[in-house]
Structures are given as structure tokens and as C-alpha cells.
Amino acid sequence: MKGGSPRFCIPMPPVLVVEAVEWLLMECAYFRDDLCSSCPSIETAYTAQVQVKQEHARALLANYPQLQWLDPVTSAEAGFRNKAKLVVGGSAKNPTLGIVDYRTGTSTDLGECPLYMEPIQAAIPVLRELIQRADLTPYDIPNRRGELKNILVTASAAGELMVRFVLRSKKLMVPIRRQMDWLQEQLPNLAVLSVNLLREPVARVEGDEEIILSERQTLPMQVNDLTLHLRPQSFFQTNTKVAEAMYAQGREWVREVAPRSLWDLYCGVGGFALHAASVMDGGSVTGIEISAEAVASAQRTVAEYRLEGVDFSAQDAPEFAVSSGTVPQMLVVNPPRRGIGESLCAWVEGSGIDRVVYSSCNAVTLAKDLERMPSYAPVQGRVLDMFPHTDHYEVMVLLQKQ
């Protein structure tokens, strides 16, 4: 690697390990040179990474001897990430797209990070040139000067792109608009283009105000046999292939239970709810999500498929459940890392719902939530490696009322 380009990861030659098993290790120059620490396990054999995550999940849920663990869902080791959060640094003439030290303002270009899907990798040089052409001044964090803070890029499985410019103000909107035709020529797969305003000097990726510049307002995301719609501020899992397996597993559990009614709390753009509806044969499905943009995305999918009995609402999930006065026959929860918390756990514990699907991106809070619901026990579980080369993973459990 010495003397060559340090801006990419290459596989090391296969090495022989015990029992003649070949492991393909990855070496990342960004990681090696202490430029990026986002993938602390990247130099660990992938099979070993998955094994560690399985053991971690099993240890946390060791108090449930009846829990049957299904085979883990693994990921591609590179080219799997469908979203790039690119902090813009440097200058308009020589911009960097990658990460930044918020204390010093020092930026590191990660333009050749191999985790990104190919359409994102191909778009980064174009976006760098756009900054130069339009003279878009990067935001200087320590001095609180400049305009362009971040560029957020999302890719669909079909290769289409959503590109969002996160700005300090509307000052750069005119030069961005002037370059739209050029950008579309360079990126014919560009589906959605928007500006997001983050006026405050805070360490956030995006603000609350979005201005869509393109004619199209949603990025279609093909997931299994469904097309989900993604609006600019809607959350979507960063690993599409593993998300497909996650939703398919949820759908299979719903198929086995065959409920007449189901709630999907923290539903996002409706992945679990819409997959469940496809096997419920006319039952009612309700999706609850705090993000109005995500709910609008889910409602677009409902309208497109002309689904009946499927409703989405922008509400706080625990507040909705506690105040609803009714209970579904089956429940799906897919909370953020903090888990579903005490109030929702208490409601579930007293609800009498027979089966609950709990999909968690933090097995530690999952274990704590299960302790708060002693009348429910996990009967099946599955680890899904949504985030290769990190300590994070998704784990799903099917809970049964005891």
C-alpha cells in the first residue's frame, strides 16, 4: 500500500486458517492510517464478526432457554451501504466529502469508501465537481462561516439516487438550481434533489426544513416484492439486502400467527406493516410513526397498491398505544436504540396480546425491555448483520404470551 492510493480498501490475499478454511480479510487504508474509525472490526474475518454478534445476543438473552435461534442473516462485506452522510470540508475549489472533527474542523475525504453502493461511489466525484462549478462554500465549523454543511446521498437497489444538500441558509439555492441540468446530465439516475436547511451551529446531520428541487419527491425502494417510497426526511435501513431479510422474517411470523389485526409501532416508511398486510388476507393493519415524512411515504405506497384496511398515522408510538383503548391481535415494534421504554413495556405487559415481534438495533435495551415484560418470552430469535465491520447489529425476536 505504501506509495499507492490510500483512498480505498483492498482484500488481502486469502490466508489458510484452522481446518483449511479460507478467510478473506479486508484492509482499509482509512482505518489503518487512523483517518476513520467507523469500522473497528474491518480487519477481523467476517465470519468471526458474525459469530461475535451471535454470541453477544445469545448471552444477553441466556435467561430464556426455550428461545430457538435461527441462522443469522449475513451481509455483503462491501458495496452494501445505501446511504452516505458526507460532511463537506476544505474549500469550494478543493472540497472534501467525508467526515470532520467537530472540535478542530479538520476534514477527511472518504470519497472511495468501499462500503457505499456503486451508484453512490460513482456520484461522489460528480458532487465534488458540482461544488467547484457552483462555488459552494463549505461550512467552517470552528469559525461558523460558510454555507454547505453536508451532502446526503441515498441509492435504491435499482441504482436511482436521492441527493440532499444541507445548507446553513438559502444563500446557495440559486447556484445549485443553475447547476441542476448539468447535474442531471452527469447523474442520469438522479431521482430526487433537495435542499435541507440546518441554520443552527449544532452537530446534527440535517435540519427540519426541506425544499425539494426536483419534480419527483420520493425515491422508490424495491424491498422484496414491494416498492416502498422514501421521502427526503424518512428513515430507511442502511443495508437494503439485510432489510429485505428482516421484513421477510417478520412477514413469515405474521403468516404463522395469522392475526386479524396488527399494529406496527415505530413503523418508519411501513416496511413491517406493508409486508404483514400482504399475508393477512383482509385483516386491519395500523402503522404508527412520529415522523410525518415517513408516514407520508407509507401512505404513498398504500395508495399506489390500493390497499384497504392499512392505515398510517404520525403519532408518538407509546402515547398511541397507551391511550388507544384497544389492542391488536399481534404487535410489531421496531424502536430506536433506546428501546420501547417503561411505559410501552407496561402497556404490552398488561395488553394480553398473544404474539409480539420485537426488532431491535440494540440487544442491550431489548434485554432490558424483556425484563419489564415478564409474562412474555422469546420463542424464536435471529441476528441480522445490518452493520458489518462494527459492533452493531439487528436482532429480531418473536415473543409469546406465557
Residue ranges and their predicted role:
Residues C28, C36-C39, C113, C267-G270, ...:
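Disulfide-bonded cysteines in secreted/extracellular proteins and peptides
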